[in-house]
């Protein structure tokens, strides 16, 4: 055992224990194209085996921000990995990608094998939901950088799309219809404000039970994993009905919807066309946040916005329904005369 390293605060044995514990979770994510297992210097993936004619790789990286603080407060670490995967694969799926593989990065003050197994099990759960292989990762024990009970989590996803099938919003025109896919809650953005509003201003705890939330513990509601939209979007991409996709993350409707819309156009959104989840009403009240500002921060119950032609709107809704997914007609694309997003 490297005694000097141990005395410096880094446990090599704990690192070995983590690898041993997570192997079964990694194995669950195996999919066509994955070559070998973990333990090499790099993760391998055979792109040729998938049969793409003009493959374009699409990548994305993200973390879960201060949602980790809520996980720590609640002592619940088994789902935060799903959030990490979701934030990455939803971004690349918004460009039409089929996720292929994922790598995670965990930095911590002290290597706790049992806790890190919980985290990685969540990462594996997310990879299974997204049908992508967990082909590598890094766990960095960094005493002096983090407190012993602190850790951070980030990830990196790579997907592929046919060059001719990349979804970039360039074909969006006036009159196209905007369809919203529901979120599962706050997802993974805005948690610095969430914590300030609920825990500092309102004085709630993760164990607070509110009638507005059906009596469920506040911590459980906040830690509801970010929805992974890969399997929701796949049949829509195959049907060729989607012109553009906006993943509603940090910046809410106001910052994300314009990212898919060509210059000279704007999104007209009809308020009341979808059910706003109760957690957002609780946040707005607790933090005394202006109602319209909420749309510039949170997803407000809509995690993805799709742009489709008016002729394909009914077909899109039928495809969603046939796959057990919900969708809401939010509004349409209009000529830009003022703001990028019109909320009325």
UniProtKB/Swiss-Prot annotation:
It catalyses: 2-formamido-N(1)-(5-O-phospho-beta-D-ribosyl)acetamidine + ATP = 5-amino-1-(5-phospho-beta-D-ribosyl)imidazole + ADP + phosphate + H(+). Keywords: ATP-binding, Cytoplasm, Ligase, Nucleotide-binding, Purine biosynthesis. One of its GO terms (biological process) is 'de novo' IMP biosynthetic process. It holds the Pfam family AIRS_C. Pathway: Purine metabolism; IMP biosynthesis via de novo pathway; 5-amino-1-(5-phospho-D-ribosyl)imidazole from N(2)-formyl-N(1)-(5-phospho-D-ribosyl)glycinamide: step 2/2. It is found in: Cytoplasm. It is an enzyme of class 6 (ligase). InterPro entries: PurM-like_C_dom, PurM-like_C_sf, PurM-like_N, PurM-like_N_sf, PurM_cligase. One of its GO terms (molecular function) is ATP binding. GO terms for cellular component: cytosol. Its main location: cytoplasm. Its EC number is 6.3.3.1. NCBIfam families: purM (TIGR00878). Belongs to the AIR synthase family. This is Phosphoribosylformylglycinamidine cyclo-ligase. It comes from Bifidobacterium adolescentis (strain ATCC 15703 / DSM 20083 / NCTC 11814 / E194a). The gene is purM.
């Amino acid at each position: 055992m490297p005694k000097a390293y141990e005395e410096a605060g880094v446990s090599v044995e704990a690192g070995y224990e983590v690898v041993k514990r997570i192997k079964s979770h990694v194995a669950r994510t195996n999919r066509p194209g994955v070559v070998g297992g973990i333990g090499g210097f790099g993760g391998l993936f055979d792109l040729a085996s998938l049969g793409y004619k003009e493959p374009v790789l699409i990548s994305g990286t993200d973390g879960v921000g201060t949602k980790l603080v809520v996980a720590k407060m609640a002592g619940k670490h088994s789902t935060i990995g799903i959030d990490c995967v979701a934030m990455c694969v939803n971004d690349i799926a918004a460009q039409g990608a089929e996720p292929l593989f994922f790598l995670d990065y965990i930095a911590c003050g002290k290597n706790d094998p049992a806790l890190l197994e919980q985290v990685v099990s969540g990462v594996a759960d997310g990879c299974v939901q997204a049908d992508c292989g967990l082909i590598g990762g890094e766990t960095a024990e960094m005493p002096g950088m983090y407190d012993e009970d602190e850790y951070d989590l980030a990830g990196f996803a790579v997907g592929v799309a046919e060059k001719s099938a990349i979804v970039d919003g360039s074909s969006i025109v006036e009159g196209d219809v905007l369809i919203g896919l529901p979120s599962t809650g706050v997802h993974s953005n805005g948690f610095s404000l969430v914590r300030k509003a609920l825990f500092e201003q309102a004085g709630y705890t993760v164990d607070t039970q509110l009638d507005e939330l059906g009596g469920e513990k506040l911590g459980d509601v906040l830690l509801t994993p970010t929805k992974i939209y890969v399997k929701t979007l796949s049949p829509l991409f195959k049907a060729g009905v989607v012109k553009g996709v906006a993943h509603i993350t940090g910046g809410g409707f106001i910052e994300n919807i314009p990212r898919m819309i060509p210059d000279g156009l704007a999104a007209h959104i009809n308020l009341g066309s979808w059910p706003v989840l109760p957690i957002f009403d609780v946040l707005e009240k607790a933090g005394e946040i202006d109602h319209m500002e909420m749309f510039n921060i949170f997803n407000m119950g809509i995690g993805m916005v799709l742009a489709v032609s008016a002729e394909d709107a009914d077909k899109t809704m039928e495809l969603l329904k046939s796959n057990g997914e919900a969708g809401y007609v939010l509004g349409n694309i209009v000529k830009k005369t003022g703001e990028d997003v019109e909320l009325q």
